Each structure stands twice: as structure tokens, then as C-alpha cells.
């Protein structure tokens, strides 16, 4: 967690840089995060009693449900995973079991902490890597192995002394060469020289066939056990000094990091700061109470998710993980089902409910221009690489937003994702011709938008297939 936790207002302000509108959802998530910090300041007895208030987000696709959770995780540096409820099956059926979401969370936590530890030891690792590169550039003489014959040992005393003296001189000469080479390396004069580096051979896992069968965890555990018994194969690869430095720095960093400590920290961070985003939760709700063989395991999946959400212990290869204080954010469009179609026990585990509103024309205008790295900025940057400066008039931006809104209303509402389709269609010809034309500046006007999109947008049948 951050040393200086953000206040709820600061969190909302940060989210506003990337996501337009949806203030209720932003506030709910901001308060949930701040409560984690407040809880950490309490004494241990009371701290154990306070559990996070899980959030259920309801709203059509493409309005920012997933993005809010993803941005929150980046802001806090918390382990975050997004999973889809439809991927899981009830115990007894072929497929992933719900406990795998906790194992995935711990793996994410391990990766985060490993990256932090690597950044801490990066200087030392680079220094060690440079020393190895110098030894590769100026290899030492291989010592003669083998037993001398007895007569040589008895009568060749002077020869042995001479050999030792020659070895010392050679060693001194070698050290001098390596010092010169290290100096050249520090100046960056040897970056394109080639060296032969011994690296671990990446072999396909024999347990890949278990993926998606619900037995992948067993496969991973067996693979770990076997990797400790069987030494890893190594092969020599020829690469530039620049590439070798990256490979060897990673190797050296791995030697400096205590993976047992990383595992312990990862479990603790996953328990205290983990966020699990369960998408498409409406798809496992029973629709209208009618049951069929096709959705026989929907309620079973809900019942399997229930103990994870309310707090249980899951065994992972890094240790046991308690889910009591993991924050769960569930989301769904709920256009075919209602939150009340979920089993009552699961409904009770998501006390905070937030409805995200549909996007208006004004929202589409803001999405196009306001966020950091907004869509229009992305397209402008892409075409700038071809030497074309792309400019959108305010009226053209408004027109694009109106087209996106009306197509959403007339066909399926896919929210802000509709803008990707609209802009690709609008700029298709320009993107295709860009490398071959000599235009420096292109202005996108309402007339241009109407010319490219008007016919398709106004024809409901066409827009269903093209936009």
C-alpha cells in the first residue's frame, strides 16, 4: 500500500483523468479504499472484526465498470485480477474451480513484489552483470586438469615453480586487459560487440494440456516439484552486449532476491490489499426462476463463490491465503436478469450497490477529448508518425458523439466501445492512404463526418452490420 494514502476526493480526481462521469461508482470505490487505510490504523482486535464492504456495479457494457476497478488497482499498487464468472463451473463439472481466482491473485501479488525487489537491487545486479560481460569478453585460460606422472612430480620441482610464476604473470596480464575492457564497457563502446551467453532453455511444459480443465494447479505444483529435482537445461546463445546485459541483469537480480520472503509478502499483500473484480456476474444468475440443463451449474457456481467472498482459507503454493479482507467488486449489465435473481446469500455479501448510467451525447464528447490519452489524441499520435497532423473541429467531435449515441440507441448499446468502431470507420481511408500522400495537415469537419458515416448511421440495417 502507498505510504501516503489518497483521500476519497483525490482518488475520484485521479479517476476523472481517465473515466468520464459515473461519480457514484467512483465515490463508492474511493470510500472502500479509504476504509482499508482507516482499518490499518485500528488495534488488532477491532481490525479483525472490520471486513470490506463489497461492491456490486450495475450498468450496460462500455460505461466504465471494469476501467474503474483497473485504474484503482494501478493507483494503489494493490494486487488486482479481473475474472469472468462464466469461466467457472460447479465442483464436479469440468472447468475452473472458483478457488483459482485467489491463486491468480497471489500470483499477481508475487509478480508485483518481485518487480519492486528487482528495482531495489537493480544497481547491484547491473554491476554484477557487467563483471560477467567483461569475463565473457576476456575469458581466462582454462586450467590443465589431470594427474601428473610420479617421476615428473619427483624430479620436476623447478618446472612446477616456473609454471606457477608464469601463471601469476598471465593472471596479472589478464586482469589488466579486463580493467581496460571494463573501462570501454562503462563508456558504452562495446554495446554492439557479440558475446556467447549461457541461458536456461525454455521448454514447453508437459502440463499445458491441463489448462482449463480445473487441474492446472495440480499441474503447476507437479511442475515445480520436478523442476527442483531435474536440473534445467542450458544452451549458449550469441547476442550483443546490450542484450546480454538485460539477460544477465535479470539472472543476477534473481540471485539477490529471497523468493521465500517474496512469497510471504505476496500472501500478506493479497490478504490485506487484494482486489478481485468479478465480471459478468449477471450471467450466472437464474433468469426468471426457469431452470434448464444448459444452466444447471449456475446456482452451483454462486454457492461456490459464496465462501470465497464471505471469507475462507485457500491453499496456494506460497501458503494459505485468507480472503476475509480481500475487496470483491462484482459487475454485470443485468439486462436479462436482476440482482435479485442472485441467491440471497450472495446478494447479502455485496452490500454496496451502484448503478452506472448510460452514456449521453455530452459524455461521448468528453470521452473523445478529456481523459489523458483520449481516443482522438491516440489517433492523432498514430497519424503523426506518417507526418500528418490531424485536427478535429468542435462541431465534428459533436457530430461523431451524436452518431455514436444514435447507433447505440438504434442497435445494441455497447457504450464507449462504439466510439472505437465509429472512429475506425471514419479514418479508414485516411489511415490506408497516409504513407503515400504528402499532406501535412488534415482537418476533420462535420461535412467529412457526414460523408463517411451519414448513410450508414441513418440506415438501421446497415449500422447493425458495419457500426
UniProtKB/Swiss-Prot annotation:
Keyword Cytoplasm in record: yes
Gene Ontology molecular function: any one: peptidase activity
Residue positions binding ATP: 20, 62-67, 279, 345, 417
CDD domains in UniProt: RecA-like_HslU
GO biological process: protein unfolding; proteolysis involved in protein catabolic process
Subcellular location: Cytoplasm
Keywords, ordered alphabetically: ATP-binding, Chaperone, Cytoplasm, Nucleotide-binding
InterPro entries to which the protein is assigned, alphabetical: AAA+_ATPase, ATP-dep_Clp_protease_ClpX, ATPase_AAA_core, Clp_ATPase_C, HslU, P-loop_NTPase
Stored SMART domains: AAA (SM00382), ClpB_D2-small (SM01086)
Origin: domain of life: Bacteria
One Gene Ontology cellular component annotation held by this UniProt entry: HslUV protease complex
Keyword Chaperone on entry: yes
Quaternary assembly: A double ring-shaped homohexamer of ClpQ is capped on each side by a ring-shaped ClpY homohexamer. The assembly of the ClpQ/ClpY complex is dependent on binding of ATP.
Membership in a protein family: Belongs to the ClpX chaperone family. HslU subfamily.
Biological function: ATPase subunit of a proteasome-like degradation complex; this subunit has chaperone activity.
HAMAP family tied to this protein: HslU
Protein name (record): ATP-dependent protease ATPase subunit ClpY
Gene: clpY
